[in-house]
Amino acid sequence: MSQPMTVQCPTCDAPVEWSAASPSRPFCSERCKLIDLGAWASEEHAIPVSPDAEDELFSGDLEAPHRGH
């Protein structure tokens, strides 16, 4: 039988077995999972995007709706 894969908890670096027996994976615990969620909510973590990306995404929201008369 093969050894289960082990990963590091992203919050505390504790080893975590990657299996169904570890329901919080990749975190070692629900506490570490909530700490990470809080970091995303307070914008300590962010996905990098180009400065113009947001403008492109929402530029259509600023345009007046077209009316077909």
From Swiss-Prot:
Gene Ontology BP terms: regulation of DNA-templated transcription
GO function terms (MF aspect): DNA topoisomerase type II (double strand cut, ATP-hydrolyzing) inhibitor activity; zinc ion binding
A UniProt-annotated Pfam family: YacG
UniProt KW Metal-binding keyword: yes
Obligatory cofactor(s): Zn(2+)
UniProt xrefs under InterPro entries: DNA_gyrase_inhibitor_YacG, Znf_NHR/GATA
Keyword flag Metal-binding: yes
Cofactor note: Binds 1 zinc ion.
Positions of region (Disordered): 48-69
SUBUNIT field: Interacts with GyrB.
Family: Belongs to the DNA gyrase inhibitor YacG family.
Name used for this protein in its record: DNA gyrase inhibitor YacG
Species of provenance: Pseudomonas syringae pv. syringae (strain B728a)
